[in-house]
Amino acid sequence: SAEDTIVADQEEDGFDYDPHSWLDPISFKAQTEEVLGILIELFPAGNETFTANAQAFMLELDKLHIGYDAAFGDSGTCSNNIAAANHNAYSYLTVRYGVEFVTVHGLDPEGEPSAADIQKVIDKINEDQISVIFIEEYTQASSVDSIVEDTGVQVLYLYTMEKAPSDSADNYLSMMNKNLDNLLTGLGCAA
């Protein structure tokens, strides 16, 4: 439903448009409902199968949301909700769950950050005593070597799912659960 969808284009909060809406299970659930409606409209004979599959998936999304909310929601177990990341792909997590990210790159992870951009991240890591920098699965850890050397942060992975997973056994739910585990580990939170 519309009230469940977050628009991460909130310039007052410093967000540029972030296309990574699937990283918020509630927004992804709303998208699933939209796709279900279109599939039923285009292929009415598949109504029962589409509906059963979508409902099962949306239940899994609800469980995923419960896990993230239990960790990072208003009464979540994680009080340290600030981390560093190489790429600004996480504004939906910020808006939904309050996990904040200081990022080296903006929305384009391929761009080359300036020395001033890197120094801002280093200063913020030191100021907020951030202990982890998250990079994406296909990003080389060496890309953040200077930050690691200057701050001693740990490098962990978050999956943005912009590309197919390197492990063919992974799917959206397994990768989102890995993200939750890595966030909990990296932020030093109780599970």
Task: Pin down the residues of each PLM region.
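Extracytoplasmic metal-acquisition and chelation regions
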Residues: 1-191
